[in-house]
Curated annotation (Swiss-Prot):
F-type ATPases have 2 components, CF(1) - the catalytic core - and CF(0) - the membrane proton channel. CF(1) has five subunits: alpha(3), beta(3), gamma(1), delta(1), epsilon(1). CF(0) has three main subunits: a, b and c. GO terms for cellular component: plasma membrane; proton-transporting ATP synthase complex. Its main location: membrane. This is ATP synthase gamma chain. The lineage of its organism: Bacteria, Pseudomonadati, Pseudomonadota, Alphaproteobacteria, Rhodospirillales.
Amino acid sequence: MASLKDLRMKIVSVKSTRKITSAMKMVAASKLRRAQTAAEAARPFAERMERMLGTLAASLAGQSGAPRMISGTGFDKVHLLVAVTADRGLCGGFNSSIVRATKAMAADLLKQGKTIKIMPVGRKAREQLRRDYGQYMIEGFENLGRKGIVFAEADQVASQISAMFDAEEFDVCTVVYNKFKSAIAQEVTRQQVIPFPVPEQAAKSETGPKAIYEFEPSEEEILAEILPRNLATQMFRALLESQASEQGARMTAMDNATRNAGDMINALAIKYNRSRQAQITKELIEIISGAEAL
């Protein structure tokens, strides 16, 4: 049985931990507001750009003059998986959900006889995926968004992906990230970015009369210029969504940890009081027994 001194030390230790988790919760809540605003602001632009490009690309799909980012390499052999996680932990299942999804995709592709490459974006992706898929890992990115995600960082990731595609190092690229739903809910999203997925009903995606486009210069030249920018835009969106999801998950995890610490303190306090009461009772019995012996 723990002594009163041990119980007091445990209570002090848990109270100290509660202060830390409470502070981390408040910091995450503050960062969440900024990250959520940024993610929600970027989402409509990225979605609109996808729809517009889908409409434009639909007319070129299958044609010999279509940009490679639409037509692809003509093969489906090598897949690049871009796993977006955080650099730090203490955010519940945020990182593990991406790692599980990436592992599931990797295992499925390998089972189909495909070749895979994994680009980790975030320290946790690198640390956790290299245990089972270290031989497939390539150079990735860490320490992004220390003061908030900026477009230049997303463009850096997109540029490396584009360079690899131009060098024919892969055929298909899929980004795996957490889409922000709320502070307590994130959705694992798998988004194919290369080749650009042309919706079957792209021309019918907009309500109302269909837009008529005039191209200057040619449609192919415009798409060849816009598609790499769209890749950077989609990466920017993925990083913003991931950052908002991370802060929401961390705030929720620290809130739960703070509550659990409070429950533990109450339980230890009850145990301490009972032990102290038992010790006092024992001492009283010893005094009374000694007095009776006299």
